[in-house]
């Protein structure tokens, strides 16, 4: 399971020109589900995302997590994160989970994050337009 997390001052996701998810200060989480992922990996990733210290403390050090700064989370499915780009000029998606499995784990991540912090989401498998203001910029690739 892969999460590309970005510390943002704002982010939103639109589907068919309608905003379906929007946050202020917090984390945009682009989530890629791979075929060997399961709820155990999802729980580990959720724990890491919610506790990863990427927000500045009073001394300006990255020492606080999204929960401590009372931020929000926007989770957007992104199957392209599971692409194999090692060969050729066209990505292979053979490492990606099946759509049913990916959607179930995506929904699980959104639900579990929402139990701890205000969480919003995109729409699984939709053509989405994501806009954000990356604060820093601060971006991390997390893989479980």
Swiss-Prot record:
The keyword Hydrolase applies. This is D-aminoacyl-tRNA deacylase. NCBIfam families: D-aminoacyl-tRNA deacylase. An aminoacyl-tRNA editing enzyme that deacylates mischarged D-aminoacyl-tRNAs. Also deacylates mischarged glycyl-tRNA(Ala), protecting cells against glycine mischarging by AlaRS. Acts via tRNA-based rather than protein-based catalysis; rejects L-amino acids rather than detecting D-amino acids in the active site. By recycling D-aminoacyl-tRNA to D-amino acids and free tRNA molecules, this enzyme counteracts the toxicity associated with the formation of D-aminoacyl-tRNA entities in vivo and helps enforce protein L-homochirality. It is found in: Cytoplasm. A motif (Gly-cisPro motif, important for rejection of L-amino acids) lies at residues 136-137. GO terms for molecular function: D-tyrosyl-tRNA(Tyr) deacylase activity; Gly-tRNA(Ala) deacylase activity; Ser(Gly)-tRNA(Ala) hydrolase activity; tRNA binding. It is an enzyme of class 3 (hydrolase). One of its GO terms (cellular component) is cytoplasm. The lineage of its organism: Bacteria, Pseudomonadati, Pseudomonadota, Gammaproteobacteria, Pasteurellales. InterPro entries: Daa-tRNA_deacyls_DTD, DTD-like_sf. The keyword Glycoprotein does not apply. It catalyses: glycyl-tRNA(Ala) + H2O = tRNA(Ala) + glycine + H(+); a D-aminoacyl-tRNA + H2O = a tRNA + a D-alpha-amino acid + H(+). Keywords: Cytoplasm, Hydrolase, RNA-binding, tRNA-binding. Homodimer. Belongs to the DTD family.
């Amino acid at each position: 399971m892969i999460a590309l997390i970005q510390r943002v001052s704002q982010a939103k996701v639109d589907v068919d020109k309608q905003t379906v998810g929007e946050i202020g200060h917090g984390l945009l989480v682009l989530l890629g589900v791979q075929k060997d992922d399961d709820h155990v990996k999802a729980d580990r990733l959720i724990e890491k995302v919610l506790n990863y210290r990427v927000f500045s403390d009073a001394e300006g050090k990255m020492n606080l997590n999204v929960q401590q700064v009372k931020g929000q989370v926007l989770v957007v499915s992104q199957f392209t994160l599971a692409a194999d780009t090692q060969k050729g000029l066209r990505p292979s998606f053979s490492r990606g989970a099946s759509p049913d499995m990916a959607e179930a784990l995506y929904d699980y991540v959104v639900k579990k994050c929402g139990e701890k912090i205000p969480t919003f989401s995109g729409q699984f498998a939709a053509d989405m337009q994501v806009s954000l203001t990356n604060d820093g910029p601060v971006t991390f690739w997390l893989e479980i």
